[in-house]
């Protein structure tokens, strides 16, 4: 006799959205020289956050505050909202899972872009949703195509990231606001803003929590350098934010992450420094791409997506050549986006390793 999995879970493949660098290092038997594939901040958290987390480590015998009271209050003050409009969770990925669970049942339709952030799709599949995708247009998620699919399919959810991962592209605030205004009230817009701190100031529409069908997601993993702490938050109309309490794991955000995020949020100087260093790293990555005859795409994130000039098979050979030389990078998973590789912002030393490895990877790719 075997355990009886649910009818939703039984047919799912035993895969994960991302193969981590640690898994690749174990397979290779050697550590990477440059870790430039996960869009982490190699510049690290605020020293004040590190100090706060170090002090909090001695108190980890206590459970976290399940209401995330202090962090929600600080975020509310930072954003000009009420703490009742904020949901804190163990990273955006978990919040996506809660969102799918909250709004969809097996067989319900969800709309996204083909090649967009795969973890959202992972949750849709895990809860039995029916995913309908539309193509990118000129390497950007296309609001018009998404909206057309919404009107045709009447989905429970529609996913849109601004800025976008994996392409680094973005839309100005007025275009995003137009999408918000056009989505019917019985469809929830899942607006992923994980990279918003890196984007031009006119990228994010104003925070309006009056619409119950718009949920915005932000994180401490990227600009704040706390990816390993697993902490992020959602911004929503009050009744929707409260609904998350029905299903979320109330002790899921660890105590050390809560304290670290609170200290990180308060250190504006460190955030400004990180944004400057990321902008400089993007320029360096772009220059390296140009020097090798490749095309760096415009980016409003902490990575640069580089068009390799041919098809996905060629880009995969370039990727493999970089990995063979100890440079961890990634690439989009579907055509035509997979003609590219994606390189995260790194230190000067990291990017020097990348610059040294790229010519050989291109030569070996043929």
Language-model regions, residue ranges each:
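N-terminal "arm"/small-domain region of PLP-dependent enzymes with the aminotransferase-like
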Residues: 1-62, 153-154
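Phosphate-binding glycine-rich loop
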Residues: 64, 69-109, 127
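PLP-dependent aminotransferase class I/II
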Residues: 67, 213-297
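Short acidic capping loops at alpha-helix termini that bridge into adjacent secondary structure
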Residues: 82-86, 106-109, 186, 193, ...
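PLP-dependent aminotransferase-like
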Residues: 102-160
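Active-site pre-lysine segment of PLP-dependent enzymes
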Residues: 141-154, 166-226
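Conserved PLP-binding catalytic core of the aspartate aminotransferase-like
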Residues: 279, 291-325, 341, 345
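PLP-dependent enzyme catalytic core of the Aspartate aminotransferase-like
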Residues: 317, 321-325, 330, 334-366
